[in-house]
Amino acid sequence: MRFIPGLLLSAALLTAAPLAFAEERTAFELQAREIYQTVVEIRSAKGQGNVPVVVDYIVRELKAGGFADADIEVTDYEIEDELVQGLMVWYRAEGTPKQKPIVLLAHMDVVDALPDTWTRYPFELIEENGYFFGRGTADNKYGVTSLVATFLRLKAEGFKPDRDLVMILSGDEETGMISTRAQAKYTDEKIKPAYVLNADAGGLSLDENGKPLLYGVQGAEKTYATFELTVSNPGGHSSTPRVDNAIYELADALKKIEAYKFPVMHSPLTLASFKSAGAQTPGPLGEAMLAFAKNPADEAAIAALRANPETVGSTGTTCIATMLRAGHAENALPQRATATINCRIFPGVGIAATEQTLKEVVGNDGVTFKLISDLVESPESNLPDEVMAAIAKALAARGLEGLPILPHMSSGGTDGLFYRNLGYDTLGIDGSGAKPNDTFAHGLNERLSVDSFFGGLDHWYIVLKDLAGAE
């Protein structure tokens, strides 16, 4: 799941900057496009059994590009009777490593797409009107392509890093994250990196005209937690209604949750985000960002930020009803009514404390709570100076020297949360960028601009050469 600077853009909006469109593509660019097309056209959604197909293709490309069998590890996971695989690839240091390894993340799976609801077939890479269309073009097949193509490019050029670079591609980030958990555990036990860099978050934020506004570094993620709230009742015949009713009782609980506002929260990272984003955002919203950054108790600023879907998540915990099911027949009183509540919890609050708050808000012991998610909590990451300097170098190479680099917190979760939970600074620093509401990740007609695709390919190349000992 892609997450980019949430103060200006919602999740999954950023994909590489539209710099000059090259008439002639380099061999590297053409190779990257071929990789992109191949992985996008593999339907690697849950239930399709195709993640191993993606793995097989990438492994063949890497071996053809000079990576040895010993550099590649494929791991198998059986998830709900489906074989899912993860992939780890080592670009090993020349001789004795001079520094701790760097781990690089992306995910090979996608949210499924129903072909009959799309304007174009979602599992064919279609280039049209300056865009690449297809499921995963933004989330996260571009991240996969960028890392794989960069490894191949560096290997072809004979680059010899002074530290190990370890590319870790998960196979079920969009669902249970079983492969993610196992890979994070392995990383902690065997690799012990200096830090982790994620290609599924971060990137350039562009205005409506395509002008870069800032580069976002994802340094934190809110904790994901989903609860089921259930009311049970003896039920009966609808012609003899009871005074109590499971649906009405659940509805009362939901209305209380709707009315409740979690406390306003902030951190140095979110205040810095609001300050930087506010300077780039025109009108009342930008003014509210700046006011909140200056004084997080400013009630007018809080009201403005919480009224905007793009900024409310950065002001505290949110819990929202997302699903309902109740009853078993149209002429029977409901014996059970269940609602699903999805929470995005501000770092440091915790899942248990959030559940307790919801119970107090509902104030009805007849409403039972069940936590149905099992994701971990993760702290904010530090921002290593060498990573920030490498990003600045990559931006300068793209003609964006001096562009503000903004740390931010994502309202959703990526593979990175498991690495943060284990104590590793994990930064989303993809080379992508897009205008607001322009990629439709997880939605219909997902796309990424062609200029964006090619404009961001050098990003990881420059960053990794800088961090791993450019020659």
Model segments located where?
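An extended, acidic, His-containing surface patch that forms the Zn2+-binding/catalytic region
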Residues: 80, 97-99, 204-206, 263-328, ...
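Active-site metal-coordination/substrate-binding segment of hydrolases
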Residues: 97-169
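Cleavable N-terminal signal peptides
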Residues: 9-10, 20
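N-terminal signal peptide c-region/cleavage motif recognized by signal peptidases
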Residues: 16-17
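N-terminal hydrophobic or amphipathic helices/low-complexity stretches enriched
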Residues: 21-49, 63-68, 114-117, 221-224
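Bacterial N-terminal signal peptides that target proteins for export
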Residues: 1-8
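Histidine/acidic-residue-rich, glycine-tolerant segments that coordinate divalent metal ions
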Residues: 162-246
